[in-house]
Amino acid sequence: MSGAPDACRADVWLWRARFFKTSTLAARICEEGRVRLTRAGLESRLDKPARAVRVGDELVFAVGGRLTAVRIEALGERRGPPAEARGLYSPLQIS
């Protein structure tokens, strides 16, 4: 029963990736429907912070007045230093 989990809560991932200073703020952004999730070509708005995200999912959201688009590369196990957090995602071009 070992191995990395294949999914993570959206708010927890956003916090671990250091896009938001607190997990409460990340949860609020998700609850307000301000995060879009693209999985297997289907786009949806997150309405719950507990919604699962997986490696390969794409997220679009606003941070500090800027639109941010990322592809999830890893789920992470903790909120680590910024260098570790940058390894959790790859930036995408916003079209």
Region locations from a protein language model:
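Strongly charged
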Residues: 2-12, 16, 27-28, 36-95
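Glycine-centered, phosphate/nucleic-acid-interacting loop/turn motifs that mediate DNA/RNA or nucleotide
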Residues: 33
